[in-house]
Amino acid sequence: TEVAVSDYDKANGITAGTGGTAYETMTIDKDKGVNEIIDGYDAAGVPDNLVADRLDSAGYSLAGQMDSDGATVLIAGATALNAAQLGKDNIWETIVDIRTAMSKANIPNDGKRYLLVTPDTYALVLKCPEFTHASDLGDAVLQTGALGKIAGFLVFEWNDTTANLAMVAGHPRFATRCKEFAVPVHLQDLSGSGRYIGASAVQGRLVYAHKVLRSVAIRAVYSPGALAVTAAQGATAGGTKLTVTGASGTLKYTKNPASRAVFGAAYGGTALTSGTTEIADCAAGDVIEVAEIVSSKVKSVGYITLKASEIKA
């Protein structure tokens, strides 16, 4: 809560109050690593620098996994908005409406609001006369990596394939990442292993977590739409039940997905009946992805981040 303001009395001063600060619990729930053996004989027989290539690949893969996990939490914790089929004639209006909603929710308009747009959406933004290219905004904007600015948002192209997701708007103050522990990617000699001779391993590890601190500060826009997902306590300890609206096909779900559902792609997951299927072994902070399946392919998705009150104690 904000600090309270009171009238000041010159003779008696002002009564001191106490802070109403609330603290968020952040569970460190991701522990990822790479461990790839490179045989010395094989490495010597390859003309290019195999070791350097695998080190680069390991670093890229770990960073990519952390970014993917972060994006899943961001999308699941966001306020979902359904837009009509986006086109060059309504993209500007859609972005302005998001700007207005965020301002009404008292999200700071301090130049740090961002808009992550998929390549298809970015193509529409480029056709807007209201879009200002980064080259016209000065070094401060260029250094952020933004491609430009529109309606007060710094625009970043985001090559995401989540079904029907067009863009995510937000402010960096209201979503966070914690890097709890890391072992940088390196080449580990395995000579002392007692098993491998002349071999090494590309190893690295990251322990981290992500959390959305305020849902109204993050807006995930789907076009033509997303599933609406709500949760309630199940019948057994650790259980929850989901109610899904907006679907005409069959439903499947994945708990804490390593990657997100892609429109038109096949989907594994577990069969889900809205309001009936109980998902077991849930914990607060778990992300549930629900996919609508039509003709064996993903048509739309919805996400929810479970709260403790939605899980049977």
Residue ranges, per PLM feature:
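Extracellular recognition modules
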Residues: V287-I293
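Extended, solvent-exposed, turn-rich assembly/linker loops in the middle of proteins
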Residues: A76-L147, F263, Y267
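Short coil/turn motif common to extracellular beta-sandwich-like domains
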Residues: Q233-A247
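Sequence/fold signature of self-assembling virion shell proteins
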Residues: T1-A4, A22-D29, C128-P224
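Short proline/glycine-enriched turn/loop motifs at strand-loop junctions of beta-rich domains
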Residues: V244-L251, A258
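Alpha-helical scaffold segments that mediate packing/assembly in large oligomeric complexes
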Residues: G40-I107, A220-P224
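Surface-exposed, short loops/turns at beta-strand junctions within beta-sandwich domains
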Residues: T276-V287
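Extracellular fibronectin type III
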Residues: K297-I311
